[in-house]
């Protein structure tokens, strides 16, 4: 009889463990949602370099620097660089984000990736929508990113509020 009681207790604890990932609203927490979404891998964001580059800790505890695909944020000495960096930090710092690899590495050895918040938002799109980066059309031809930049520009959002914002690729050429 004692074995039956132990089995029932074990089954109850097992059931409780698997159902505890559910919130009272019936929605799953972000960990459960992440497991259902399809990403190449997940990283814990541990550092923000600028508005398009961040450091992430893999599940194997390896720290890597990533470059966000499709956007180009102001360089460190450029106007609006601090605001762009802070905006990216507010979006992803300290969070576990989903990563889809676009290309193996850029010229600095960084993996170029699409990044998704725990809620599933495309971080590159969010940076463009907020006017915190340029659409990097040299490498990305998607209509969505072009439209987001155009809308931010039209609304004078973020860096587009400046009279003459200088794209980072022009800034880099000028300041080699």
Model-derived features: positions:
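Small beta-barrel nucleic-acid-binding modules, primarily SNase/OB-fold domains
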Residues: 2-176
